[in-house]
Protein backbone atom coordinates (compact mmCIF):
# COMPACT_ATOMS: atom_id res chain seq x y z
CA UNK A 1 0.00 0.00 0.00
CA UNK A 2 2.99 2.33 0.47
CA UNK A 3 3.21 2.75 -3.31
CA UNK A 4 -0.15 4.58 -3.20
CA UNK A 5 1.38 7.32 -1.01
CA UNK A 6 4.56 8.12 -2.93
CA UNK A 7 5.50 11.22 -4.88
CA UNK A 8 5.74 9.02 -7.95
CA UNK A 9 2.14 7.83 -7.55
CA UNK A 10 0.90 11.38 -6.92
CA UNK A 11 2.66 12.54 -10.11
CA UNK A 12 0.79 9.83 -12.04
CA UNK A 13 -2.48 11.00 -10.44
CA UNK A 14 -1.76 14.60 -11.40
CA UNK A 15 -1.12 13.57 -15.01
CA UNK A 16 -4.46 11.69 -15.04
CA UNK A 17 -6.47 14.67 -13.76
CA UNK A 18 -7.93 17.30 -16.03
CA UNK A 19 -6.73 20.87 -15.40
CA UNK A 20 -8.43 22.04 -12.22
CA UNK A 21 -9.18 18.44 -11.20
CA UNK A 22 -8.98 17.46 -7.54
CA UNK A 23 -7.47 14.38 -5.92
CA UNK A 24 -9.06 13.60 -2.55
CA UNK A 25 -7.66 10.95 -0.24
CA UNK A 26 -7.19 10.02 3.40
CA UNK A 27 -3.84 10.88 4.96
CA UNK A 28 -4.01 9.11 8.34
CA UNK A 29 -4.76 10.43 11.85
CA UNK A 30 -3.03 13.50 13.28
CA UNK A 31 -3.45 11.95 16.73
CA UNK A 32 -2.20 8.41 16.16
CA UNK A 33 -0.11 8.70 12.98
CA UNK A 34 1.04 12.32 13.02
CA UNK A 35 4.49 11.74 11.51
CA UNK A 36 3.01 9.65 8.70
CA UNK A 37 0.33 12.26 8.05
CA UNK A 38 2.98 14.98 7.79
CA UNK A 39 5.01 12.89 5.33
CA UNK A 40 1.97 12.15 3.14
CA UNK A 41 1.11 15.84 2.99
CA UNK A 42 4.75 16.67 2.19
CA UNK A 43 4.54 14.18 -0.68
CA UNK A 44 1.36 15.77 -2.03
CA UNK A 45 2.88 19.26 -1.71
CA UNK A 46 5.91 18.17 -3.70
CA UNK A 47 3.60 17.41 -6.65
CA UNK A 48 0.53 19.66 -6.36
CA UNK A 49 0.58 23.45 -5.91
CA UNK A 50 -2.65 23.37 -3.87
CA UNK A 51 -2.94 20.90 -0.98
CA UNK A 52 -5.59 21.36 1.70
CA UNK A 53 -5.85 18.91 4.58
CA UNK A 54 -9.16 18.62 6.38
CA UNK A 55 -10.32 16.75 9.46
CA UNK A 56 -13.32 14.66 10.43
CA UNK A 57 -14.09 12.33 13.30
CA UNK A 58 -14.52 8.83 11.85
CA UNK A 59 -16.54 6.55 14.17
CA UNK A 60 -15.19 3.39 12.51
CA UNK A 61 -11.64 4.41 13.47
CA UNK A 62 -12.66 5.94 16.80
CA UNK A 63 -10.52 9.01 16.25
CA UNK A 64 -10.01 12.20 14.32
CA UNK A 65 -8.98 11.39 10.76
CA UNK A 66 -7.36 13.56 8.12
CA UNK A 67 -8.08 13.75 4.44
CA UNK A 68 -6.58 16.04 1.82
CA UNK A 69 -7.60 17.65 -1.42
CA UNK A 70 -4.83 18.29 -3.94
CA UNK A 71 -5.03 20.15 -7.24
CA UNK A 72 -3.05 22.10 -9.79
CA UNK A 73 -5.31 25.12 -9.19
CA UNK A 74 -8.66 24.35 -7.51
CA UNK A 75 -8.54 25.61 -3.92
CA UNK A 76 -11.34 24.53 -1.57
CA UNK A 77 -10.47 27.41 0.77
CA UNK A 78 -11.36 29.86 -2.00
CA UNK A 79 -15.02 28.81 -1.82
CA UNK A 80 -17.42 30.65 0.47
CA UNK A 81 -20.11 28.79 2.41
CA UNK A 82 -22.72 30.32 0.07
CA UNK A 83 -20.83 29.08 -3.02
CA UNK A 84 -20.65 25.54 -1.63
CA UNK A 85 -24.36 25.59 -0.76
CA UNK A 86 -25.22 26.87 -4.26
CA UNK A 87 -23.18 24.09 -5.89
CA UNK A 88 -24.86 21.46 -3.72
CA UNK A 89 -28.31 22.83 -4.62
CA UNK A 90 -27.41 22.92 -8.33
CA UNK A 91 -26.63 19.19 -8.14
CA UNK A 92 -29.78 18.38 -6.16
CA UNK A 93 -27.83 17.51 -3.00
CA UNK A 94 -30.22 19.12 -0.53
CA UNK A 95 -30.53 16.44 2.13
CA UNK A 96 -26.92 15.70 3.11
CA UNK A 97 -26.45 14.90 6.78
CA UNK A 98 -22.90 16.23 7.24
CA UNK A 99 -21.72 18.37 4.37
CA UNK A 100 -22.80 21.97 3.78
CA UNK A 101 -21.14 25.28 3.08
CA UNK A 102 -20.61 25.86 6.79
CA UNK A 103 -19.16 22.40 7.45
CA UNK A 104 -16.95 22.72 4.35
CA UNK A 105 -15.18 25.67 5.96
CA UNK A 106 -15.16 24.03 9.40
CA UNK A 107 -13.57 20.82 8.08
CA UNK A 108 -10.75 22.87 6.54
CA UNK A 109 -10.13 24.83 9.75
CA UNK A 110 -7.23 23.00 11.38
CA UNK A 111 -6.80 23.02 15.17
CA UNK A 112 -3.55 24.36 16.67
CA UNK A 113 -1.99 20.95 17.33
CA UNK A 114 -2.38 19.98 13.66
CA UNK A 115 -1.01 23.32 12.45
CA UNK A 116 2.03 22.81 14.71
CA UNK A 117 2.48 19.25 13.42
CA UNK A 118 2.39 20.41 9.81
CA UNK A 119 4.75 23.34 10.47
CA UNK A 120 7.56 20.86 11.20
CA UNK A 121 9.66 19.67 8.25
CA UNK A 122 8.65 16.28 6.88
CA UNK A 123 10.34 14.13 4.26
CA UNK A 124 8.14 13.17 1.29
CA UNK A 125 7.53 9.48 0.66
CA UNK A 126 9.28 8.09 -2.42
CA UNK A 127 9.38 4.65 -4.03
CA UNK A 128 11.18 2.22 -1.73
CA UNK A 129 10.29 4.05 1.51
CA UNK A 130 8.31 2.58 4.37
CA UNK A 131 5.61 4.34 6.34
CA UNK A 132 6.98 3.38 9.73
CA UNK A 133 5.82 6.02 12.17
CA UNK A 134 7.95 6.59 15.29
CA UNK A 135 4.89 8.06 17.00
CA UNK A 136 3.42 4.51 17.06
CA UNK A 137 6.02 3.50 19.65
CA UNK A 138 3.93 2.60 22.74
CA UNK A 139 6.56 4.32 24.90
CA UNK A 140 6.37 7.57 22.92
CA UNK A 141 4.76 10.43 24.76
CA UNK A 142 1.68 11.80 23.00
CA UNK A 143 -0.40 14.40 24.74
CA UNK A 144 -3.47 16.03 23.27
CA UNK A 145 -4.60 18.69 25.73
CA UNK A 146 -8.10 20.00 25.08
CA UNK A 147 -8.12 22.47 27.97
CA UNK A 148 -5.50 24.31 29.99
CA UNK A 149 -4.00 22.48 32.86
Question: Where are the regions that the model predicts?
Answer:
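A short glycine-rich, Lys/Arg-flanked "PGG" loop and its adjoining helix->strand segment in the class I
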Residues: 5-19, 41, 45
Amino acid sequence: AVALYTCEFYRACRRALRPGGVLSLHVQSPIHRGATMARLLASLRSVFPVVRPFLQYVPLYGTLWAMAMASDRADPLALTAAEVDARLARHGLNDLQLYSGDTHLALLSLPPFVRRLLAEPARPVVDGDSLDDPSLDPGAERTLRLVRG
